[in-house]
């Protein structure tokens, strides 16, 4: 083998150097010398190799080595030896590491081998194993070991039968055998048995090695000790066939059983069927020679055999021979009948046996008509093996005689119904069979005897029938009668009869038929027969059933009509009728009269004058004209006419309709004016007038005499009358005239010359109001916001003093004369109108004091308070003390142009 690799040599050198160093240290310490072997204990797979390191701490040993019986090689040093043991096969070996250092130093090791369970053998099973008997399972695992680490398991399929561990066996022991005795069962049939071996070396740091044997299949069987049941005849006739059967119960598996059936030296071909654990074989047995033969049945299973045997006697027994002296004999001729059979058979002719077995039997007689077609029978019996066998023969005699026409075969009188096909038969007795011919005595029609054909009245009459053969002829007269049903035609019995009310009439029908019929008529669904003259009244009109009765009875329906003039009945044509719009209902006016009168109703006055009233048809159909949408109410005159007269009736027609709510009566979007009279959000058409209820969010609208802004919203309105209801969703909007809700001045105190001030006017109105301003003439630099609600003045001057009028306008009115007066630095006046100079001078001192002392800080104006007060109002809405002086000036006269008294506000302009 090759030496150690360079890497291994380096490793060994390192260990040697390390060991020498340790030895030096030991020598210095004067420790005892020793020898060491690594590894001391090892487990190696059989045939493998192992490196051993033998070393000592002796500084200079005289000699050393590794003693073992195994092949080895490897490097060495002064104080160490490295050896590779190869092809280790012995179960156990003990190598010795030794060195000579004044004394002999030794170290012993232990090397053991293991072998995997590569071969697991299950001893072959018997080809068939009887159920209920024991068989042996034996498993061998040669060479595997150590045995103490082995475990063997015997298995049936995946089921463990027995498991054995060999723990505690000697370490050198190898291989193992496990044997078990098992009782064979039916369910073991076809089962696979196997052996599993486990070598567990995990405690030694190795793995678990497993292997299993090839499975061996077991075939079990059960065969009863009883013999098969054989069913077969005791005797069998030559060249005849007979069924034989063989049955055996208690087989397992029955499908594996074999059956052998044979008669003598001839093997039969059985048909085998299985019935649970029973096998049944049936076959057809036949033999060609007389004698005693053995019938054998054998059943084999699992190498065992059960059989049964029976003796069968094969015989020959011909049928008896029956002869007639003349098979066809003339009437009155002597006839001899003879019956013969085999030598051992006893014959019997017509119940009379022969004198002895093997003797013939005879019968003689004179042939007569009654013997024609007579059959003669002969029986032959044979006693064989305790059984009585019998056979018979027969012969028929034909007797020749002249024709005979009997009433049974050819009646003198025939009666047939007309119409259905019949087969006309007139048969004669005779041998040979006679030919029969039937024709009228006057040489007319000939009957087609024996053929299927229709029966007509023309066939009725008397015929002469002749039957003839070689023995003679016979003649007979026959009469044919053809019956037919009564005929009720339109001449003798018309289908429709018309009588006039008040006259005399009778209902009679004449019918023809064979045999002659009788005729009677009754009213439909009544029992009384109509006879004699009748005084015609309307109640006689209707349908009558006339019956003509003979053997082929016939019935016919006759409709009798009684005519009379028109007449109106209140129940079928009412005097008062109400038409409901949309009901698709027409006026029904049914008039009594025959023929059916025509009816027409025409308006006589008012809106319906000259108009035709549509009438409901008597027999409605899809093609009838459509129902009119509008029908004029009023008085109509109905006239009914037929050929016998006319009748007149007056009908009052009124029209009603279900509720209807649409944009014409109840717009879905409505606009109301605040303060107007409240009429409700909805109305509806209909007759009678519908009742309308409206609710908003489920609550009914409160009753208010005048429209309020709170009435705005969406309503569900339902209109109802006797003919139905209608609903509609209505959205209500409320509009109102402008009201100035806010007037504000900023700043709220005085304005110095050159300062800025702003006037704001806000109005409430729907639709929204348009705002406009009127400023003092010549006031410069006035600015307005986009919607005119704010007026601003930058750099106020004396020219900005005066009236500023805010006007709010929409379609329902306007609010105006909201006035602000800007006073100059020396004049402090705030009054409701443009008063004269004298009045202003007189009131100046008091007003200046009012302006200076009033808390006008908020800069807001409450229009509603101002409209209800005659006082001058401050910008924050507080009342002033101008009193009546403001009401009596010229400005008060101008107030007639506006809906409310003008309000005046003062903004003080002070010097800079």
UniProtKB/Swiss-Prot annotation:
Superkingdom as given in the UniProt entry: Eukaryota
Transmembrane segments: 827-847
Cellular compartments per GO CC: plasma membrane
PANTHER family reported in the protein's UniProt record: INTERCELLULAR ADHESION MOLECULE, INTERCELLULAR ADHESION MOLECULE 5
Transmembrane as UniProt keyword: yes
Residue ranges, Extracellular side: 30-826
PTM annotation: Glycosylation at Asn-53 is critical for functional folding.
Membrane topology: Single-pass type I membrane protein
Disulfide bonds: 54-97, 58-101, 139-195, 246-297, 339-378, 410-465, 493-546, 573-638, 666-717, 761-806
This protein's UniProt keywords: Cell adhesion, Disulfide bond, Glycoprotein, Immunoglobulin domain, Membrane, Phosphoprotein, Repeat, Signal, Transmembrane, Transmembrane helix
UniProt protein name: Intercellular adhesion molecule 5
UniProt topological domain (Cytoplasmic) ranges: 848-912
Gene from which the chain derives: ICAM5
Role description: ICAM proteins are ligands for the leukocyte adhesion protein LFA-1 (integrin alpha-L/beta-2).
Organism name: Oryctolagus cuniculus
């Amino acid at each position: 083998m090759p030496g150690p690799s360079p890497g291994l040599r380096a490793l060994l050198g390192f260990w040697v150097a390390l060991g020498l160093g340790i030895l030096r240290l030991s020598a210095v310490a004067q420790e005892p010398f020793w020898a060491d072997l690594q590894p001391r204990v090892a487990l190696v797979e059989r045939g493998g190799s192992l490196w051993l390191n033998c070393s000592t701490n002796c500084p200079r040993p005289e000699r050393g080595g590794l003693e073992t019986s195994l092949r080895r090689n490897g490097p060495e040093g002064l104080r160490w030896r490295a050896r590779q043991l190869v092809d280790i096969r012995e179960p156990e070996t003990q190598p010795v590491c030794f060195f000579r250092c004044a004394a002999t130093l030794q170290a012993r090791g232990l090397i053991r081998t293991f072998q995997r369970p590569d071969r697991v053998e299950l001893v072959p099973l018997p080809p068939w194993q009887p159920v209920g008997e024991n068989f042996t399972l034996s498993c061998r695992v040669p060479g595997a070991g150590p045995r103490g680490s082995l475990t063997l398991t015997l298995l049936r399929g995946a089921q463990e039968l027995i498991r054995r561990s060999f723990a505690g066996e000697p370490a050198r022991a190898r291989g193992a055998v496990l044997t078990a005795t098992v009782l064979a069962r039916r369910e073991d049939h076809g089962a696979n048995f196997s052996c599993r071996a486990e070598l567990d070396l995990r405690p030694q740091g190795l793995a678990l090695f497993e292997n299993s044997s090839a499975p061996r299949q077991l075939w079990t069987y059960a065969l009863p000790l009883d013999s098969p049941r054989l069913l077969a005849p005791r005797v069998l006739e030559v060249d005849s066939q007979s069924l034989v059967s063989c049955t055996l119960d208690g087989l397992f598996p029955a499908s594996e059983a074999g059956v052998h059936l044979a008669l003598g030296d001839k093997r039969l071909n059985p048909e085998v069927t299985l019935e649970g654990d029973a096998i049944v074989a049936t076959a057809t047995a036949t033999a060609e020679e007389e004698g005693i033969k053995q019938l054998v049945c054998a059943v084999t299973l699992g190498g065992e055999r059960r059989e049964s045997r029976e003796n069968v006697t094969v015989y020959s027994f011909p049928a008896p021979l029956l002869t007639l002296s003349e098979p066809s004999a003339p009437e009155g001729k002597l006839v001899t009948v003879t019956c013969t059979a085999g030598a051992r058979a006893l014959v019997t002719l017509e119940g009379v046996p022969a004198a002895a077995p093997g003797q013939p039997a005879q019968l003689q007689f004179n042939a007569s008509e009654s013997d024609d077609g007579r059959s003669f029978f002969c029986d032959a019996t044979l006693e064989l093996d305790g059984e009585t066998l019998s056979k018979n023969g027969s012969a028929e005699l034909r007797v020749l005689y002249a024709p005979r026409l009997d009433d049974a075969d050819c009646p003198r009188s025939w009666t047939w119904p007309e119409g259905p096909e019949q087969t006309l038969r007139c048969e004669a007795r005779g041998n040979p069979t006679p030919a029969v011919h039937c024709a009228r005595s006057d040489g007319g029609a000939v009957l087609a005897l024996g053929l299927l054909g229709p029966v007509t009245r023309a066939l009725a009459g008397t015929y002469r029938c002749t039957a003839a053969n070689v023995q003679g002829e016979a003649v007979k007269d026959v009469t044919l009668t053809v019956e037919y049903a009564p005929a009720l035609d339109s001449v003798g019995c018309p289908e429709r009869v018309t009588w006039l009310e008040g006259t005399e009439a009778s209902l009679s029908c004449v019918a023809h038929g064979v045999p002659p019929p009788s005729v009677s008529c009754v009213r439909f669904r009544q029992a009384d027969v109509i006879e004699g003259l009748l005084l015609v009244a309307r109640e006689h009109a209707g349908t009558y059933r006339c019956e003509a009765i003979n053997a082929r009875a016939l019935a016919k329906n006759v409709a009798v009509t009684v005519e009379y003039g028109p007449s109106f009945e209140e129940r079928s044509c009412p005097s008062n009728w109400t038409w409901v719009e949309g009901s698709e209902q027409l006026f029904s006016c049914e008039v009594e009269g025959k023929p059916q009168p025509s009816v027409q109703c025409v308006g006589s006055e008012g809106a319906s004058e000259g108009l035709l009233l549509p009438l409901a048809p008597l027999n409605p159909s899809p093609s009838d004209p459509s129902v009119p949408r509008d029908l004029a109410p009023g008085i109509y005159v109905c006239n009914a006419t037929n050929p016998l007269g006319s009748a007149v009736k007056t009908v009052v027609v009124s029209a009603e309709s279900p509720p209807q709510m649409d944009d014409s009566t109840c717009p879905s979007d409505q606009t109301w004016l605040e303060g107007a009279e409240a009429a409700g959000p909805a109305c509806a058409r209909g007759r009678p007038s519908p009742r309308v209820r409206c609710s908003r969010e489920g609550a009914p609208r409160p009753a208010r005499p005048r429209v309020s802004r709170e009435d705005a919203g969406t309503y569900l309105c339902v209109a109802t009358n006797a003919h139905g209801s209608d609903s509609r969703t209505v959205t209500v909007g409320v509009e109102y005239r402008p009201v100035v809700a806010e007037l504000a001045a900023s700043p709220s105190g005085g304005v110095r010359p050159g300062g800025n001030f702003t006037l704001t006017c806000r109005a409430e109105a729907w639709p929204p109001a348009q705002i406009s301003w009127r400023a003092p003439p010549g006031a410069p630099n006035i600015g307005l916001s986009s919607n005119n609600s704010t007026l601003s003045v930058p750099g106020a001057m004396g020219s900005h003093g005066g009236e500023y009028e805010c006007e709010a306008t929409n379609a329902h009115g306007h609010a105006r004369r909201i006035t602000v007066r800007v006073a100059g630095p020396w004049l402090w006046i705030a009054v409701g109108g443009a008063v004269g100079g004298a009045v202003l001078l007189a009131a100046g001192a008091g007003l200046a004091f009012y302006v200076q002392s009033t808390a006008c800080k908020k800069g807001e104006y409450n229009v509603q308070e101002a409209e209800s007060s005659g006082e001058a109002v401050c910008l924050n809405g507080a009342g002033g003390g101008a009193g009546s002086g403001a009401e009596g000036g010229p400005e008060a006269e101008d107030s007639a142009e506006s809906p409310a008294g003008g309000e005046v506000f003062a903004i003080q302009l002070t010097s800079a």
